[in-house]
């Protein structure tokens, strides 16, 4: 049974001299553009409701100005909301006083930024252990913990190097190691890989997924890259002009877009690379499978599409990890999915 780790309810953020007044205008139907031109206020977020599951990667995506970075900064109250409620493990984050909020930021959450945010005068190991030093850990213990995570992200031998000696990808590994060293349950990643070259970005995505399979953190990941979102997200929330357009499983974002905006967002995606057999299979219900070929439920369509073209089977049987038949895909359905 899934557990809600972070719950966001009716969240509004209006930037300006009188945000409460601005919010009333928004509730009365004033749009983002009119709010800016007529009332000189900026609509950051409008009535956001989102449940983020424990031990999952929740992707929040949208174009520039959609509100995604504003939203993630509300979780640890780097930005205060105009209205709404945020609870973490059933605790009201809005009710925290300064000390409680400070402890929450130190112990429960960690952030990884797009621009790395490393201390240029500190070595790699000092950057990674910075949070532990601020919490009062003994130097030996802080160094031991930091060394463990430096190894985990593949930076052995770079402990005494300075940030300027590292490539962008290596600097972001330092940022990730620093976040993980604090052993926080919640990892907030704001466009963490967006500034990296494509190959380095792919490496970082793989590192994150590998670590997540071991650590099972609750990760909130901001991106404007749909391919990245589909690769790493357990769920994807798409924002437009500060409003939530759709929050769904990656396969459902692709197969069942709920708005024209989401439909346009996903129209150029190579479905064979991101959809697995289990995403498109149907129940067997006594179907004759004697002439079917077999694929694993976690196989991407791309993996078996050539075989389909060559063998032209009437049906594809989908099996789980125990080789049990769990569903089927007809050639017609596969063709329809790839043509959408």
Model-flagged regions — what are they?
Residues 290-313, 317-322, 327-340:
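The conserved cystathionine-beta-synthase
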Residues 162-166, 170:
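Conserved ABC ATPase signature
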Residues 25-34, 91-92, 133, 140-157:
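Conserved ABC ATPase "signature" region
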């Amino acid at each position: 049974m899934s557990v809600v780790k972070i719950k966001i309810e009716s969240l509004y953020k209006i930037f300006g001299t009188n945000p409460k007044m601005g919010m009333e205008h928004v509730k009365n139907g004033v749009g983002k553009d009119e709010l800016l031109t007529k009332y000189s206020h900026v609509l950051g977020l409008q009535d956001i409701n989102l449940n983020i599951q424990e031990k999952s990667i929740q992707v929040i995506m949208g174009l520039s100005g959609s509100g995604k970075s504003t939203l993630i900064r509300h979780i640890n109250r780097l930005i205060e909301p105009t209205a709404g409620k945020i609870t973490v493990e059933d605790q009201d984050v809005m009710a925290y006083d300064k000390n409680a909020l400070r402890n929450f930021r130190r112990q429960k959450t960690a952030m990884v930024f797009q621009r790395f945010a490393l201390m240029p005068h500190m070595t790699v190991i000092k950057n990674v252990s910075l949070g532990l030093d601020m919490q009062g850990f003994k130097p030996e213990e802080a160094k031991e913990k930091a060394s463990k995570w430096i190894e985990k992200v593949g930076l052995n031998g770079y402990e005494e190097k300075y940030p300027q000696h590292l490539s962008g990808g290596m600097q972001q590994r330092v940022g990730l190691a620093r976040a993980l060293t604090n052993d926080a349950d919640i990892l907030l990643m704001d466009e963490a890989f967006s500034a990296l070259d494509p190959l380095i970005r792919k490496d970082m995505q793989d590192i994150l997924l590998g670590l997540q399979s071991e650590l099972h953190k609750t990760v909130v990941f901001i991106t404007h890259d749909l391919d990245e979102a589909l690769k790493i997200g357990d769920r994807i929330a798409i924002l437009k002009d500060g409003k939530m357009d759709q929050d769904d499983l990656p396969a459902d974002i692709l197969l069942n877009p709920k708005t024209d905006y989401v439909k346009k967002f996903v129209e150029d995606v190579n479905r064979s690379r991101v959809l697995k057999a289990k995403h498109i299979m149907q129940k067997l219900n006594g179907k004759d499978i004697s002439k079917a070929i077999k694929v694993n439920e976690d196989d991407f369509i791309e993996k078996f599409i050539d075989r389909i073209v060559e063998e032209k089977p009437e049906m594809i049987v989908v099996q789980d990890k125990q080789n049990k038949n769990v569903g089927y895909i007809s050639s017609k359905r596969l063709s329809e999915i790839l043509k959408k």
